[in-house]
């Protein structure tokens, strides 16, 4: 398949720069992958799409304030985006500077954080933080929320709360699992009251999620690696749900990728069950032709043209159905990307 198959033109004014005042105040487009039918509603009404006994699977990663601005000791400006914390005092990071820093280069970030570049790991730089406090403590104190490049504004205090799900638990992401941003405590309680079961996986979203696909033949694209964990209690909940003839509904593409990574690993080992616990990096790339083993429906935001996430939802609901739904969303002026509106998609 060609990259251009997943292209569409999005008017600039439809890119949401800020979230809605209330988390549940977004619009919700319902797409039935079986027939391509589209329905327009509000996220606050999402309960009508779920039934008692269904399982909703959320990603409980916590976004770390991973962006640090500063300068080299010699004076040149630098911008650091932590990709992964590797120990209490080290991290892998993207570093933007007029000249790539060499090993031994010292950086002064946010006027208080002293860092030494110790080497490279592919496109990433290995950083040593020269402090007694942990990297995470330093980031929580001095870092900026790593807003995506298309939210073209400086981060604000409100982003510390709003670019984070209400159920976040495990620090490690440098981008939010954005479908989850629409859920607040009252809607989570309403789901439980309705008899819907909730489960939590972890996938630490990396900055690679914003990297463009650079090949024309999408099968040649190499996915970035992200850490994912699907614990035993989630496996049990999935198997239980399937046994009862109910649906597994993923909240976000990261939950889809976590569950299907666990299922893929299970199949490769020749397990009898469709899914088993998973606790490692995943490079799963889901595009049309992929056979879903676990996920029956999903909540997701609107994605960038030609992105791997467009390919994932096209695999899930049919490319033509997705492209038609997107054209309708654009015509009706839905808000796009991380702080934008949501979709509820049922599998083709």
From Swiss-Prot:
Keyword annotations from UniProtKB, A to Z: Cytoplasm, Queuosine biosynthesis, S-adenosyl-L-methionine, Transferase
Entry annotated with the keyword Ligase: no
GO biological process: queuosine biosynthetic process; tRNA wobble guanine modification
Domain of life: Bacteria
Reactions listed under catalytic activity: 7-aminomethyl-7-carbaguanosine(34) in tRNA + S-adenosyl-L-methionine = epoxyqueuosine(34) in tRNA + adenine + L-methionine + 2 H(+)
Subcellular location: Cytoplasm
A single cellular component GO annotation: cytoplasm
Keyword Iron-sulfur listed: no
Pfam assignment, any one: Queuosine_synth
Quaternary structure and interacting proteins, as annotated: Monomer.
PANTHER family assigned to the protein according to its UniProt record, in alphabetical order: S-ADENOSYLMETHIONINE:TRNA RIBOSYLTRANSFERASE-ISOMERASE
Family, per entry: Belongs to the QueA family.
Function summary: Transfers and isomerizes the ribose moiety from AdoMet to the 7-aminomethyl group of 7-deazaguanine (preQ1-tRNA) to give epoxyqueuosine (oQ-tRNA).
Protein name per its UniProtKB record: S-adenosylmethionine:tRNA ribosyltransferase-isomerase
């Amino acid at each position: 398949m060609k990259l251009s198959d997943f292209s569409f033109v999005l008017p600039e004014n439809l890119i949401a720069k800020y979230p809605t005042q209330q988390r549940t105040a977004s619009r919700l487009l319902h797409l039935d992958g079986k027939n391509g039918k589209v329905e327009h509603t509000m996220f606050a009404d999402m309960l009508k799409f779920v039934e008692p006994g269904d399982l909703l699977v959320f990603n409980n990663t916590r976004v770390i304030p991973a962006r640090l601005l500063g300068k080299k000791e010699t004076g040149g400006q630098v911008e650091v985006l932590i990709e992964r914390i590797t120990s209490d005092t080290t991290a892998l990071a993207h570093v933007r500077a007029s000249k790539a820093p060499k090993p031994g280069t010292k950086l002064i970030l946010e006027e208080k954080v002293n860092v030494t570049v110790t080497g490279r790991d592919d496109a990433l730089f290995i950083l040593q933080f020269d402090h007694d406090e942990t990297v995470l403590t330093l980031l929580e104190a001095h870092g900026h929320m790593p807003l995506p490049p298309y939210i073209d504004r400086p981060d604000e205090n409100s982003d510390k709360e709003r670019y984070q799900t209400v159920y976040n638990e495990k620090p490690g992401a440098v981008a939010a699992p954005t479908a989850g941003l629409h859920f607040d405590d009252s809607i989570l309680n309403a789901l439980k009251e309705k008899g819907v079961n909730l489960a939590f996986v972890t996938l630490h979203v990396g900055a690679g999620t914003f990297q463009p696909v650079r090949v024309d033949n999408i099968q040649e694209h190499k996915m970035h690696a992200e850490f994912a964990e699907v614990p035993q209690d989630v496996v049990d909940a999935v198997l239980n749900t399937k046994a009862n003839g109910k649906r597994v509904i993923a909240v976000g593409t990261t939950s889809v990728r976590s569950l299907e990574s666990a299922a893929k690993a299970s199949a490769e080992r020749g397990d009898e069950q469709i899914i088993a616990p998973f606790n490692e990096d995943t490079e799963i790339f889901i595009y049309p032709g992929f056979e879903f083993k676990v996920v029956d429906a999903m909540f997701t935001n609107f994605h960038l043209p030609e992105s791997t996430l467009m390919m994932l939802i096209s695999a899930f609901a049919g490319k033509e159905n997705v492209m038609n739904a997107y054209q309708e969303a654009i015509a009706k002026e839905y808000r796009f990307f991380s702080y934008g509106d949501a979709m509820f998609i049922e599998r083709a």
